[in-house]
Curated annotation (Swiss-Prot):
Entry protein name: 2,3-bisphosphoglycerate-independent phosphoglycerate mutase
Record field: catalytic activity: (2R)-2-phosphoglycerate = (2R)-3-phosphoglycerate
Coiled coil: none
Gene name of the encoded protein: gpmI
Transferase found in the keyword field: no
Keywords assigned by UniProt, alphabetized: Glycolysis, Isomerase, Manganese, Metal-binding
Source organism: Legionella pneumophila (strain Corby)
Length: 514
């Protein structure tokens, strides 16, 4: 399996396009390779947010949604939209899983512990989903509910938890079924990099009520943390009011709908082979409900089970006998594999995967290059091996460093990426390969919000670039959306896209002049 001129699809995570140079780390960075391509190579802009990627109108894009749409070549109704619709049409309040759990807890006189990200961000969760759960508990006259709230500050402004708490308290006046028993920044509760030292104090708080920090109410705690320059994301695990830890027979409901940052905390309760840290206690739960499927190996009761997708890009390449490589650093590995394959765990025939470890630093502005140099070396070796027809890679820097809100560090990250792109193209050129470059959503092109007068750490709703390097082809449309990438890539390979792919082919071969 060799002598292939490889086609590389490079996904620059969080690299959006913004005409406005102000607060734009991409525009500020010195990017000779990118600038040369932008002036000389075919390129267009793609929509990567809202309705074109199965999200509510004007909702910013995110990595999971972006990669699913790049890989699927069709609009997929996202879990966020599915759950919103279920709330609006009354199906949420009739969900059999919720009713079964509450009925069982009423019988046994045990408690329901609802945990998740209290946020209007719509990336990992939405607070309206929590509010709908409270309304359902009230409708069923079930009042033994304890809330364990994770704070955002990453997909929302860094200090915005008080706004969400105000909305929650208004709901608790209407539906007086629950008490807030703990708060914690997502940095701890929603780690996805096996940094168990972050997750352990969250687990101890949830299962033993143990915390170095205790306050009578959530607002007092947050005011204290803000005074000490600790924003929402980094609030340490904190006990609120009277201790109500998770006991035998209780049920846990995790209302995050996005899987990647829910898996680790879920595994502390459910993984029989768990080795992250020593669990002093392991409650025997009656149920662990997850809003969606977090991992096929974590046996949760799923409120909104997955809808399977057929004929994603990976499957089509495999069925045509082509070899493919997926490569990313830890932070985005799930995105180029699980999410790119439509939320499917299985690996296709002739699909290989390489994960380059992400650096172990507290926040990525401390190492803006992340593991891009190592990733580039590995990618170049794969290109030179000529073992793969298609290589799908992700560079995490623009997104992960952009999330820190540190402008200068994000500029450094972009400059590092430009050098990496240059090196990758030299290897591709030497092997007769082609390069498609795009992004899953915006981030680094807008680093400060004048509206909130805070760093803009969240994703944006800006379009993303779609650039072709390799000659012989041109774009036929002035703009597109992420679902057009897979059909266009297949066209470059001479493969007709399957009927499931409703995205358009945006590239056409140049006609030879007679």
């Amino acid at each position: 399996m060799s002598h292939n001129a490889p086609l590389v699809l490079m996904i620059l995570d969080g690299w959006g396009y913004n005409e406005n140079d102000r607060y734009n780390a991409i525009a500020k960075a010195n990017t000779p390779q990118w600038d040369e391509w932008w002036q000389t190579c075919p390129h267009i802009l793609l929509k990567a947010s809202g309705l074109p990627v199965g999200l509510p109108d004007e909702q910013m894009g995110n990595s999971e949604v972006g990669h699913m749409h790049i890989g699927a070549g069709r609009v997929i109704q996202q879990d966020f939209t599915r759950i919103n619709e279920a709330i609006n049409n009354g199906k949420f309040a009739k969900n059999a899983v919720f009713h079964e759990v509450i009925d069982q807890l009423k019988k046994t006189e045990k408690s329901l512990h609802i945990m998740g990200l209290l946020s209007p961000g719509g990336v990992h969760s939405h607070e309206q989903h929590l509010f709908a759960l409270l309304a359902l508990c009230n409708q069923k006259k079930f009042r033994s509910v304890h809330l364990h709230l994770f704070l955002d500050g990453r997909d929302t402004p860094p200090q915005s938890a008080l706004d969400s708490l105000k909305c929650l308290n208004e709901e608790l006046v209407k539906h007086p079924v629950a008490t807030i028993n703990s708060i914690c920044g997502r940095y701890y509760a929603m780690d996805r990099d096996k940094r168990w030292e972050r997750v352990e104090p969250v687990y101890n708080l949830l299962t033993q009520g143990k915390s170095e920090h205790q306050f009578p109410d959530a607002e007092t705690a947050i005011h204290f943390y803000y005074k000490n320059k600790i924003s929402d994301e980094f609030v340490p695990p904190t006990l609120i009011g009277k201790e109500h830890s998770i006991q035998d027979g209780d049920a846990v409901l995790f209302f995050n709908f996005r899987a990647d940052r829910a898996r680790q905390l879920t595994s502390t309760f459910l993984d029989p082979l768990f080795k992250g840290f020593e669990r002093k206690t392991l409650p025997k739960l009656s149920y662990f409900v997850s809003m969606t499927q977090y991992d096929k190996n974590l046996i949760t009761t799923i409120a909104f089970p997955p809808v399977p997708l057929n004929n994603t890009l990976g499957e089509v390449l495999s069925s045509h006998g082509l070899s493919q490589l997926r490569i990313a650093e830890t932070e985005k590995y799930a995105h180029v594999t699980f999410f790119f394959n439509g939320g499917c765990e299985s690996v296709f025939t002739n699909e290989e995967r390489i994960m380059v470890p992400s650096p172990q630093v507290a926040t990525y502005d401390l190492q803006p290059e992340m593991s891009a140099p190592e990733l580039t070396k590995t990618l170049i070796a794969a290109i030179n091996s000529r073992d793969y027809h298609v290589i799908i890679c992700n560079y995490a820097n623009a997104d992960m460093v952009g999330h820190t809100g540190n402008f200068e560090a994000t500029v450094q990250a972009i400059e590092c990426l430009d050098q990496c792109m240059h090196q990758v193209w030299q290897a591709l050129k030497n092997n007769g390969g082609k390069l498609l470059i795009t992004a899953d959503h915006g981030n680094a092109e807008e680093m400060f919000s004048e509206a909130t007068n805070q760093a803009h750490t969240a994703h944006t709703s800006e379009p993303v670039p779609f650039l072709y390097v390799g000659g012989g082809w041109h774009f036929t449309h002035a703009e597109g959306s992420l679902i057009d990438i897979a059909p266009s890539l297949l066209a470059l390979l001479g493969i007709t896209p399957p009927p499931e792919m409703t995205g358009r082919i945006l590239l056409e071969k140049n006609h030879a002049h007679v």
